[in-house]
Amino acid sequence: MEPIRLNTIEEAIADFKEGNFVIVVDDEDRENEGDFIIAAEKITPEKVNFMLTHGRGVLCAPITEERCAELELDMQVSSNTSIYETPFTVTVDLLEGCTTGVSMHDRAMTIRALADPKTKPADLGRPGHINPLRARSRGVLRRAGHTEASVDLAKLAGLYPAAALIEIINEDGTMARLPQLVEVARRFGLKIISIKDLIAYRLQMESIVDRGVEVDMPTQFGHFRLIPFRQKSNGMEHIALIKGTWDTDEPILVRVHSSCMTGDIFGSCRCECGEQLHKAMEMIEAAGKGVIVYMNQEGRGIGLMNKIAAYKLQEEGYDTVDANLHLGFDADERDYGVGAQILREIGVKKMKLMTNNPVKRIGLEAYGLEITENVGIEIKPNPYNERYLKTKKDRMGHTLHFNK
């Protein structure tokens, strides 16, 4: 059986710019689906009909966060608990020139209106028949989803940053997977690409971090080298702690650790962060080679003030997930794209990832890094963090083993 070959990102961009559909597939560990995607400004009633006839999924229109704000499009819910946190806003219809909003003509008009800078909030009726999606800033380098891939393709093609997408479903009602998606692309003469390749293309074309000078860093856990990095988008500073050298294709121990001031510095018993960090350093020292990327992403990305507010909610009975949601955040707000580029910058291609968190594995693999092994880094619970760890196991899918 011949290996499946996808198109290059350059080929897809050229077709997208001409107003053609592109099929975009994501990681098999994520949604494992493919979508028809087209630039919003290129949509027509005929193309909407094609999407609904041959895609059969939910017709959506990804737009930027800024465009959502301009059009005063609120999110459908304040706390998004869907599996992949699909960022639906309120649904809309264009008011002028449309009737019920459901016809192919009306849906095309509404999608094009979302990509028209002249469209104002009052021009859109709510609810409607089009589902706008709010793409995260920095696109697939922030979130490896079809929503962000759509807006990225529009930007790379020099078009207005808005698109239309729909999931591709087989005639029997099952989700189309890669072999079927390749056949769909062949049947309709379309380009097909992966989000992973789009991420790799952007990482190759763009630099999102600045690298500082390298210094020796002797610690109580071993002798390391330290390199600071500054994130270009917001000035946040991160650290790579490096031990030894390795061959290009050699898998090494890697820990991507989000900063935890309370645990890492003060030894808080409310979490296991400090103990995990120190155990990772000990394991890398024993192995003679490896990397810890220390990310400035306090409280799973919500910041110290909000993390302490979440602690207060936990004292009132909320678990760690519901506390974040109550404060208006996702359960995990971390940005794995920055950590991935730091790893690539220091020459890591393959890794034995030290984590109990399956989302971290998916997040890093989406950025073109190969994880050859998952190395658990479990810490014995104490009376102060047992409920917290149980929530991470039960609600966030962490691989943890301890008695109730």
UniProtKB/Swiss-Prot annotation:
Protein EC: 4.1.99.12, 3.5.4.25
Cofactor or coenzyme needed: Mg(2+); Mn(2+); Zn(2+)
Catalytic-site annotation from UniProt: D332, R334
Cofactor annotation remark: Binds 2 divalent metal cations per subunit. Magnesium or manganese. Binds 1 zinc ion per subunit.
Binding site for Mg(2+) 2: E31, H146
Sequence positions that bind Mg(2+) 1: E31
Metabolic or biological pathway, per its Swiss-Prot or TrEMBL entry: Cofactor biosynthesis; riboflavin biosynthesis; 2-hydroxy-3-oxobutyl phosphate from D-ribulose 5-phosphate: step 1/1; Cofactor biosynthesis; riboflavin biosynthesis; 5-amino-6-(D-ribitylamino)uracil from GTP: step 1/4
Signal peptide: none
BP GO annotations: riboflavin biosynthetic process
Gene Ontology CC terms: cytosol
Annotated positions binding D-ribulose 5-phosphate: R30, E31, D35, R143, A144, G145, H146, T147, E167
Keywords: GTP-binding, Hydrolase, Lyase, Magnesium, Manganese, Metal-binding, Multifunctional enzyme, Nucleotide-binding, Riboflavin biosynthesis, Zinc
InterPro entries attached to this UniProt entry: DHBP_synth_RibB-like_a/b_dom (IPR017945), DHBP_synthase_RibB (IPR000422), GTP_cyclohydro_II (IPR032677), RibA (IPR000926), RibA-like_sf (IPR036144), Riboflavin_synth_RibBA (IPR016299)
Site (Essential for DHBP synthase activity): H129, E167
Its job: Catalyzes the conversion of D-ribulose 5-phosphate to formate and 3,4-dihydroxy-2-butanone 4-phosphate.
Family: In the N-terminal section; belongs to the DHBP synthase family. In the C-terminal section; belongs to the GTP cyclohydrolase II family.
Annotated protein name in UniProt: Riboflavin biosynthesis protein RibBA
Species of origin: Bacteroides fragilis (strain ATCC 25285 / DSM 2151 / CCUG 4856 / JCM 11019 / LMG 10263 / NCTC 9343 / Onslow / VPI 2553 / EN-2)
